[in-house]
Structure formats: structure tokens, C-alpha cells
């Protein structure tokens, strides 16, 4: 686990450089315009500041596709080189044109970092701390701004401040970032798997997780390569084997899955329910809140919510279902505690899959499973390294005459992956290992109370899909999972065709929508207004009495502004995986609205200057703190989680391009808006956008905390089909 943390910290150094650059140009431009006489030519002054935005926008148009082609690590190395070269060019800068070139190169580096660091961290982080690690870029970016403002403020106190030195000092941290990317950062294991480089991916995962056994996660990565596979939600009834009767409208006995508990003589069965629809499953297992909200809520949000919702009777978290691995059960009710459950017999024919061994193998695989087991038992049980509360046994109790056994592995965040293998005899009578079985179905350890009672029967829902297959020949040793087709085969074909997949389109709506609303929520306007606010609060007079010039005072004020963000971001890092992304957004956006409305009122109503300064200062501080807790990091975190591996780079590039275009629009429209509708009008407009943002998050943005990336993308696929089905009804 420490390996993933250190790798995320190293990658987030790139965002420190971004924040560093943003702050240094804000201070250096005060001296640049004096040297080049730009007071009468504000367009050139604005171009110097904006050239970094232009460079970031240009590079973003191709960064995602190239990252999917060449890898994440080479692009991060390139960004460090661009930072380094750009800083040296700015340090030299004999004229404005060379300075513009240096700013453009620097912008290229910024664009690559903003696009790729969230992808890289998401693809290397374990699910249980992915939110924390993906908040690091926000923290290091703000930290870089604070350090840079302090440096520029110190230089501004010199008799002859050098703007070239202010900008050129960037080459030192950029050189550090270069060495980190070249000698410390590994390639993303998910990208390696997508290219069929399995041994490299396995070694990287072993380093990131700090353990040798990463087979479960390797299987997960392969299973997550497909896009748009047919996945269905099925309903099951689980109960004691001798008590399940026809009264529960269950299928015939041949369809049952038999389970064995740890207690001798105790067995249970899971049987499919006839006629259970996807939407009926959601209505039973979804939250009571979503039922009250009616049809406005996206079914996708309800589906994700069912994973995290607490079961009211037992206090346990709902176990959830999962893709490409067959059946996975969502269970509530009283069950024997601390039991491990294994499959005994699975009936129901699976589909045939081609094998790269040729036509001599006609076996299919037993559907594997991913399950989430988060119950009230968590309080009583020690945490494992990867947060798994219950596990499957690698050797089944029922392994016997048929040569069947069950295997299972943790994949982080309390999730497990498991499948069943069979042994068969070849022509000479020798047993052949590793051939998948011919039937599908799987079951998970059940949460619950202290024993069986009246509530022996429980409802269960399963997300069932067909697996993406590959062969053990990929590793030339033990198999990683039940698959037969080389992973690189799944990445062939048109990327643009995959963008039309309903699940991908739904994810793009969420990602692009968040980026647009974030930029129009007012952060640039509040940053622009902050020096004026603090001046009114008397900070400027206090600093001038200390002998600090107005230019130096503005830099110090900006440093103080960024400093107050850091504790708030630290709190967000803690809450991102506890409360969740959606919850943080829904909680913090109302405070942004209130802060903006107070700023509107303070600028419309005539009041005592001291009262005005206090209200404005408190509002600005609250706005900054709660913005960086929610709307600052959450959009990038969510965008890095909701797209399939095959198109993750290009989809995040689309989201990042939206970010930069909106950033440019907001930056250049702000002076015009201030002149036309005034400060109160601008903040009022931002407050309206924040209200729209809250509604958008409430209706469209699901909770993704603690879920493996491959599970998230499969949920988007299922949710999109559910939404289409709901429209057609």
C-alpha cells in the first residue's frame, strides 16, 4: 500500500509545478510590463498570462489519445521535460516573443499534467484510498501556489526584483519531477494489461501493493478491458437447503447453487426468481430516498447508491454485484456470522468461448465473481492489508470426485474476485489443470447476525455478465484468471466507435457537465476579487504601515489566500473515501451558494465599512475552503474513475479540454461582466450556476467511493441500459 502512496505523491509533484507556475506569473507580470512598457498595451500583457492556458488547451486535444497509445508514464516524462525547457527559455527571454514561447512550452507541460496525473493515480491506487490519493494533486497544486507566492514576495522585497529569476526558478522543481518520472514512477498496470504486457503489469502491482499475490487484481484488470458487454441484473432467494420451497416462486432444483458454510452440516442454496426485472430489483434494493425522489433521479445514481446504502435491519452495508465475473450477490438479513461460503454445484449452461488452444477444448468457464463485503463485523475484525473483511477459501471443502474447487482473492476496497476451476482427464487418463468448467454461477460470503432464525430467507441481486477471456500462456506460468483471449485483442478496433457506447456517453455527460459547472461556479471571480476584499478589511493599510509596497502586499495577500486552502484540502483528503465524492459535493455546494449570496448582499446594501469588510472576508474564506473540499478536486477524481480503460485517456482529454475552454471563457469574460453588470451581478450569476450544479450532482452524479474502476464502468453500462429501458416503457 505504501508503494501506491509514494507513487501518487511523486506524480502529484507535476501539479505542484502547475500551481507554482500560476503563482509566479501573477507576481512576475507586475515587473514584466514595466520592462517591456506594456502599460499601454494590455493585450500583450494578457497574452503573456494566457499563453500557458493556450498551450494547455492545444496539448490536451491530443494528450489523451497519445497516452492510450504510448502509455501514461512517457507522457508524464514529456511533461517534466516541457516544464524544464520552458523554465529555461523564460529565464533567458531577451524579448517578449521568446517569453511567449517559454510560456507556451510551459503550458504544454501544464496540460499534460492536468490530464494525465488523475488517470495515473486512479489506475495505480487501491480502491479504498483512491479518493485520498487523487486529492493530492489539489493539495500539491495549492501548496505550490503558496510556496511560489512566498518566493515571489521575498524577491519583491529586493531592490531590483528579477522577473526572469521568478519564472526561471521553476527549472529546479521541474528537474526533480523529471528524475521522479524517469527513475521512480512505474507504468500504469492497467495500461500494461491493455497492451498484453502481463508480466510487467504483475511486477508493477506487486510493487504498488507490497505483496506477491496480486492475482485477483490482475484478473480484474483483464476483465475490465471490454466495453459495452451484455450485463443483466438477476434476482435470487437464498435460504437453508432443506427449507427453500416452491412458495417463493423459485426456479426448479436444477438451477440452484448450493452453498456450504463453515459449520459442519450447514448448507444453503441460492435459486433464481422467475420474472424479476432489473427495475424491480432496484426498487427493492435501492434506497428509500431514491423512491421518494421519483423519476428525476438517474437510475444510474440509484444503482450506485444501492452499493453503499446501509441495510436498516442489520446495520450492514449492502454487498454488491459485479461484472465480467458472473454472479455477485447483494444480501441482507440474518445469516450465520463469520462464515465462508463456497460453491458446490452450479447448473445452467454458460456460453461457449473460443480458446487460443484451438478446437480441442470445449469447456466453458464457471462465472467468477466480484463481491463487496462491508458489514458491522468490521468493528470486530482486524483489517487486512487490502481491507477485505471476508475471503473465499482457495481450497474448497467440496473438492472431491469431480475435481472442482473454488478460488478467491481480494482486489482491494473490501472486494473479492473468485471463480471455479475443474480438472478433466486427457486421452491418457492424466488430469489437466486449469480448464474452466462448463456452468456459471457464484456466491459470496454472507453478512449477518449470530445465527439462523425466523429470517432465514434473504433477497439477493446479482449482476451477471460474460467474461473477457485470456490464457495462462500469457504468463508462461500459473493462470491469473479464467480467460482465453489475449488482452490486447480487446483494444483493437475503432476508439471512436467505443465512444458511442451508452455507458461511455453517460459517463461523458457526467464528466463534461462537472467540468463546465466547476469553472462557472465562480472560483476565478472570487480569486480576482480577493485582494480587494482583504484591502477593505484593512490588511493593505497594515502592510503599508510595515513598509511593504503595494505590489509586495498584493503578493502576500495572495499567499495568505492560498494558505487557508491547505487545511481544508487536508480535511477533504480524509473525507473523500469516507463520506464520498457525491456527498462532499452535495454538502459543500450549498455553502458556496451562501457565501456568494453574502457577497452579493454586501455589495448591494450600504453598511458600515468594518461590517462590510468582515462579512466579505468571512465569505471569501468560506468559499475557498469549501470549494477546495468539494468542487475543486471532485470533478477530476470522478472523471478519472468513470471511463473504461480502453477509452479512459481520450475521454479524460475531452473533459480536460472542456475545462480549459471554460477556463479561458471565464477568465476573459470576467472584466466584461464586471463592467456591464457589476460585482454583485457577477456573484449572483455564479450563485445561480452553483444552484444548477447542486441539482446536476443530485440527479446525475453517482457515488464511486471504494469501488474498483472496472466495477464503476460496468455499472455505467448497466445504468445506461436501464435508463433507455425506462424511457421506452
Swiss-Prot record:
Modified residues (Phosphoserine): 438
Molecular function GO labels: transmembrane transporter activity
Gene3D superfamilies for the chain: MFS general substrate transporter like domains (1.20.1250.20)
Positions with biased composition (Acidic residues): 347-363
Feature: compositional bias, Basic and acidic residues: 423-434
Major site of localization recorded for this protein: membrane
Record's keyword annotation contains Transcription: no
UniProt xrefs under SUPFAM superfamilies: MFS general substrate transporter
Cell compartments where the protein resides: Vacuole membrane
The protein's name in its UniProt record: Monosaccharide-sensing protein 2
Native organism: Arabidopsis thaliana
Amino acid at each position: 500500500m505504501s508503494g501506491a502512496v509514494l507513487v501518487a505523491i511523486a506524480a502529484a509533484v507535476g501539479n505542484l509545478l502547475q500551481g507554482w507556475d500560476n503563482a509566479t506569473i501573477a507576481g512576475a507580470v507586475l515587473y514584466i510590463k514595466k520592462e517591456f512598457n506594456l502599460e499601454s498595451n494590455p493585450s500583450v500583457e494578457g497574452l503573456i498570462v494566457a499563453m500557458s492556458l493556450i498551450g494547455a488547451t492545444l496539448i490536451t486535444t491530443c494528450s489523451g489519445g497519445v497516452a492510450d497509445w504510448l502509455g501514461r508514464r512517457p507522457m508524464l516524462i514529456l511533461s517534466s521535460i516541457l516544464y524544464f525547457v520552458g523554465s529555461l527559455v523564460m529565464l533567458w527571454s531577451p524579448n517578449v516573443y521568446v517569453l511567449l514561447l517559454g510560456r507556451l512550452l510551459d503550458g504544454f507541460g501544464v496540460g499534460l499534467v492536468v490530464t494525465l496525473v488523475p488517470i495515473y493515480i486512479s489506475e495505480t491506487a487501491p480502491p479504498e484510498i483512491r479518493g485520498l490519493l487523487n486529492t493530492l494533486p489539489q493539495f500539491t497544486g495549492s501548496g505550490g501556489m503558496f510556496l511560489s507566492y512566498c518566493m515571489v514576495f521575498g524577491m519583491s522585497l529586493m531592490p531590483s526584483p528579477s522577473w526572469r529569476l521568478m519564472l526561471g526558478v521553476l527549472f529546479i522543481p521541474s528537474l526533480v519531477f523529471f528524475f521522479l518520472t524517469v527513475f521512480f514512477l512505474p507504468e500504469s498496470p492497467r495500461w500494461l494489461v491493455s497492451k498484453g504486457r502481463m508480466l510487467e503489469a504483475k511486477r508493477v502491482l506487486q510493487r504498488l501493493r507490497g505483496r506477491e499475490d496480486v492475482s485477483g487484481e490482475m484478473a480484474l484488470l483483464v476483465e475490465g478491458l471490454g466495453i459495452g458487454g451484455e450485463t443483466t441484473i438477476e434476482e435470487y432467494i437464498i435460504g437453508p437447503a432443506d427449507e427453500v420451497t416452491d412458495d417463493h416462486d423459485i426456479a426448479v432444483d436444477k438451477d440452484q447453487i448450493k452453498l456450504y458454510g463453515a459449520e459442519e452440516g450447514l448448507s444453503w442454496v441460492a435459486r433464481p426468481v422467475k420474472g424479476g426485472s432489473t427495475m424491480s430489483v432496484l426498487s427493492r434494493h435501492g434506497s428509500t430516498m431514491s423512491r421518494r425522489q421519483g423519476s428525476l433521479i438517474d437510475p444510474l445514481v440509484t444503482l450506485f447508491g444501492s452499493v453503499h446504502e446501509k441495510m436498516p435491519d442489520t446495520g450492514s452495508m449492502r454487498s454488491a454485484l459485479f461484472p465480467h465475473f458472473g454472479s455477485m450477490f447483494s444480501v441482507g438479513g440474518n445469516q450465520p456470522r463469520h462464515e465462508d461460503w463456497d460453491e458446490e454445484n452450479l447448473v445452467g449452461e454458460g456460453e461457449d468461448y473460443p480458446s487460443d488452444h484451438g478446437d480441442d477444448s470445449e469447456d466453458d468457464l464457471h462465472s467468477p465473481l466480484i463481491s463487496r463485503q462491508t458489514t458491522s463485523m468490521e468493528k470486530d475484525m482486524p483489517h487486512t492489508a487490502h481491507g477485505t473483511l471476508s475471503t473465499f477459501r482457495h481450497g474448497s471443502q467440496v473438492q472431491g470426485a469431480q475435481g472442482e474447487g473454488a478460488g478467491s482473492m481480494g482486489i482491494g476496497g473490501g472486494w473479492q474476485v473468485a471463480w471455479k476451476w475443474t480438472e478433466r482427464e486427457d486421452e491418457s487418463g492424466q488430469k489437466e489443470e486449469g480448464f474452466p468448467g462448463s456452468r456459471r454461477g457464484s456466491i459470496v460470503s454472507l453478512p449477518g447476525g449470530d445465527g439462523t432464525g425466523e429470517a432465514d430467507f434473504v433477497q439477493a441481486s446479482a449482476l451477471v455478465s460474460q467474461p473477457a477471456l485470456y490464457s495462462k500462456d500469457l504468463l508462461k506460468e500459473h493462470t491469473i484468471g479464467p480467460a482465453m483471449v489475449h488482452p490486447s485483442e480487446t483494444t483493437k478496433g475503432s476508439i471512436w466507435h467505443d465512444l458511442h457506447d451508452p455507458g461511455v456517453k453517460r459517463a461523458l455527460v457526467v464528466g463534461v457537465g462537472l467540468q463546465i459547472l466547476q469553472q462557472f461556479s465562480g472560483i476565478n471571480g472570487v480569486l480576482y476579487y480577493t485582494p480587494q476584499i482583504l484591502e477593505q478589511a484593512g490588511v493593505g493599510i497594515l502592510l503599508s504601515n510595515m513598509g511593504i509596497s503595494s505590489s509586495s502586499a498584493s503578493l502576500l495577500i495572495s499567499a495568505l489566500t492560498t494558505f487557508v486552502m491547505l487545511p481544508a484540502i487536508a480535511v477533504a483528503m480524509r473525507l473523500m473515501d469516507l463520506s464520498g465524492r457525491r456527498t462532499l459535493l452535495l454538502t459543500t455546494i450549498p455553502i458556496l451558494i451562501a457565501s456568494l449570496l453574502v457577497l452579493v448582499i454586501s455589495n448591494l446594501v450600504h453598511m458600515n465599512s468594518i461590517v462590510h469588510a468582515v462579512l466579505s472576508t468571512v465569505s471569501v474564506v468560506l468559499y475557498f475552503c469549501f470549494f477546495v473540499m468539494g468542487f475543486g478536486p471532485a470533478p477530476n477524481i470522478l472523471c478519472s474513475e468513470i471511463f473504461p480503460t480502453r477509452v479512459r485517456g481520450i475521454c479524460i482529454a475531452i473533459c480536460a479540454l472542456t475545462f480549459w475552454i471554460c477556463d479561458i471563457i471565464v477568465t476573459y469574460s470576467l472584466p466584461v461582466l464586471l463592467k456591464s453588470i457589476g460585482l454583485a451581478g457577477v456573484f449572483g450569476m455564479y450563485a445561480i450556476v452553483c444552484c444548477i450544479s447542486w441539482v446536476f450532482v443530485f440527479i446525475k452524479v453517482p457515488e464511486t467511493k471504494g469501488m474498483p474502476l472496472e466495477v464503476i464502468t460496468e455499472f455505467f453500462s448497466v445504468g445506461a441500459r436501464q435508463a433507455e429501458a425506462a424511457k421506452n416503457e
